[in-house]
Regions:
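Extracellular/luminal Protease-associated
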Residues: 97-194, 257, 261, 589-592, ...
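Catalytic-core environment of secreted peptidases
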Residues: 16-25, 32-37, 47-56, 79, ...
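Long, charge-rich, low-complexity alpha-helical segments
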Residues: 505, 583-637
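Noncatalytic luminal/extracellular "stalk/propeptide" segments of secretory-pathway proteins
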Residues: 2-8, 13-17, 21-138
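Short alpha-helical segments that sit at the start of domains
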Residues: 557-589
């Protein structure tokens, strides 16, 4: 069956309304990792799958605050919250909020003070740097805009504050209360203070009261507890003729309501599971099986991979659903397909983009039904930040991509509600995902030839679009970018060879990859001609001169928090300022996966610079040195 026919079948079977119903049910649970709310949500997923005819499994991995998975990620400890309240008591009374009325009011893994406590409130700016603590905060609450874990360390651990009250001044919606968490290990829970999160508008009110009244007393009460728990992963599968799988994954965690992030992905995955059953009953036979996973983001995925290393090798492709189905008019987002990874270039993002493009066409293209809405979507350079990143690690080298919408003005707040989701967009993304899974699971020589043509076409369009943008970046950088785009995309096309046994088909894959390299070479020649006629500026290329050859020591994604907490104060504060005050990115997760133990640091920087033109050589060098110092990288002898 041709790809376009499979897309039509998927569009006919997937229901956006059913998907939204599943999302609504999931959004009723307060789904903090390793909490009772997550457990209840996992049981809902498991029970629903059983009703659909699956035989689901509920995997449990210790979440005790001390277990280390894949030699780099310490499991969170279980935590639950029962009730909480925050209010100003003096010099006037102001009710700020209560839990569970505001699900994000309590910082996840806050300490418990069931009888409550009154204390003075001190504004400490970001609260992340020593020079902001101009007065003694011992026994007091601090109001801060910085990262909760860092503020907690500075205010509570180092200075004896009672607790922290966090706000985010960068939120687009000033009345939204952000989701905030700290992640204490087992040996740190006795040092945890109270933690609250408030809206920016509430923070401005407190700041104004402090300015007018001189001092404020606030009352904070949290009834919560830490306990030994589990990271729970729900798994279901439909077997194919081979003991190999296409994996569809979504993270189930995040606080109530967490509709877009990520009840949307989890609910849509249930609908895909339902629709897949129906299509297999009607007409499809699978070579590869299709496996479904619902996980606590990163932590659960890493624990699962650590526990099932052998079976992970049987996964041939991974599609991650993380924040899908939002009404773009409401949230302001664009649906993105996570692109080709520089450290593991594969065909899957190119195929996923084409599938989405076909699924986003008017439904009447396939039938006489209603039109689908217009959709903003794009193929973006590789980004990490979700569970696909665990599988695409060069250690496993599994083709992986994700459908994800970004930005979202309600992201990680109490206003991330089901009302912001669109059944029609859920239908488009669900159809694309289902069609992609079916196509991959029923691969044959004919479909492989079709895939080569599709991937080549998408890759050429991607380069053409970026070529015009590159003209603005100067000849030297444009040449560097083209060099690596040619490398990444040709390797992505040739990765289809791994699925091929027929010699003629394999030859066709290799030929198309070679032709793509020739195409990119022609673009480089065109660039040189533009330079010769003075139509493009010249620029100085950034460089890092470091001949060391370094390799990873961990079989997991980089845990930056683990690195920062082990650095000397001055070095730690450099990264804190860079990331959380200047709000710059340095792609630490991508950089880590580029270290293969074969190339010089100079060459790793060059490839990362080609991926991200704003790469800063000094920050890159500092990061590399920090990773060596903390044992995440080691020098090859």
């Amino acid at each position: 069956m041709r790809f376009i026919e499979i897309v039509g079948k998927a569009l006919t079977e997937i229901s956006g309304n059913l998907a939204k119903d599943y999302v609504m049910e999931i959004s009723r649970f307060h789904r903090i990792q390793a909490s009772p709310g997550f457990h209840e949500a996992a049981l809902f997923i498991k029970d629903t799958l059983a009703e659909l005819g699956y035989e689901p499994k509920l995997h449990k991995f210790p979440a005790d605050g001390k277990r280390v998975y894949l030699d780099g990620w310490v499991a969170p400890i279980g935590w639950r919250v029962f009730e909480a309240e925050l209010k100003v008591t003096k010099p006037e009374k102001v009710n700020i909020g209560r839990y569970p009325e505001i699900p994000t009011l309590v910082i996840a893994r806050s300490a418990s003070k069931p009888d409550g406590i009154e204390a003075e409130l001190i504004d400490v700016g970001t609260g992340m740097f020593d020079n902001e603590y101009k007065v003694d905060v011992e026994g007091k609450f601090v109001l801060a805009s910085g990262r909760a874990r860092i503020v907690h360390e500075k205010a509570v651990k180092e200075r004896g504050a009672i607790g922290i009250i966090i706000y985010n001044e960068k939120l687009e919606v000033p009345d939204a209360v952000p989701y905030v968490a700290i992640w204490p290990t087992l040996d740190e829970i006795d040092k945890v203070g109270l933690g609250f999160s408030i809206s920016y508008r509430q923070a401005l009110r407190l700041k104004n009261l402090l300015k007018r009244k001189g001092s404020l007393t606030v009352y904070g009460m949290v009834k919560s507890e830490f306990f030994q728990s589990h990271l729970e992963v729900v798994e279901a599968e439909i077997e194919g003729s081979l003991n190999e799988y296409v994996l569809l994954i979504a993270h189930l965690c995040h606080p109530k309501p967490g509709a877009h992030d990520n009840a949307s992905g989890s609910g849509l995955l249930l609908e895909i599971a339902r629709a897949l059953q129906k299509l297999i009953e009607k007409e499809f036979k699978l070579n590869l099986g299709v496996k479904f996973l619902w996980v606590p983001e990163f932590y659960g995925t890493i624990a699962y991979v650590d526990s099932y290393k052998d079976s992970i090798r049987n996964i041939k492709a991974v599609v991650n659903l993380d924040m899908v189905g939002a009404s773009q008019e409401k949230t302001g987002g664009v649906l993105t397909v996570v692109g080709v990874a520089p450290f593991n270039p594969t065909f899957l993002p190119l195929l996923a983009y084409y599938t989405l493009k076909e699924s986003a066409k008017p439904l009447r293209y396939y039938s006489d039904h209603e039109m689908l809405p217009s959709l903003k979507y794009t193929l973006v350079p590789y980004i990490d930040g979700s569970d696909h990143h665990v599988f695409i690690d060069p250690i496993w080298s599994i083709p992986a991509t994700a459908y994800t919408e970004w930005p979202d003005k309600y992201y990680h707040t109490n206003l991330d509600s089901v009302d912001n989701l669109s059944p029609k967009i859920l239908k488009i993304v669900g159809s694309a995902t289902l069609a992609l899974a079916l196509y991959l699971a029923s691969f044959n020589n004919k479909s492989l030839i079709e895939s080569v043509c599709i991937c080549d076409s998408v890759a050429r369009s991607y380069v053409e679009e970026r070529f015009l943008e590159l003209l603005k970046d100067g000849y030297e950088y444009a040449s560097l970018k083209l060099k690596y785009l040619g490398k990444w995309m040709s390797e992505a096309i040739s990765s289809l060879e791994l699925l091929v046994e027929n010699p003629k088909v394999k030859e066709a894959v290799i030929k198309r990859s070679r032709e793509f390299k020739e195409y990119v070479a022609s673009k480089a020649s065109a660039l040189a001609r533009l330079k010769d006629c003075g139509c493009i500026k010249t620029v100085k290329i950034k460089r890092v001169d470091d001949t060391r050859v370094l390799m990873r020591t961990k079989k997991c994604p980089l845990h930056l928090g683990n690195v920062l907490k082990r650095l000397p104060k001055a070095e730690r504060e450099y990264f804190i300022r860079y990331l959380f005050v200047e709000r710059k990115s340095f792609g630490h997760d991508i950089i880590y996966f580029l270290f293969d133990g074969k190339r010089k640091v100079t060459d790793v920087f060059e490839e990362y610079y080609a991926h991200y033109k704003d790469a800063d050589p000094d920050t890159f060098t500092r990061l590399v040195d920090a990773l060596v110092k903390t044992g995440w990288l080691k020098e090859q002898s």
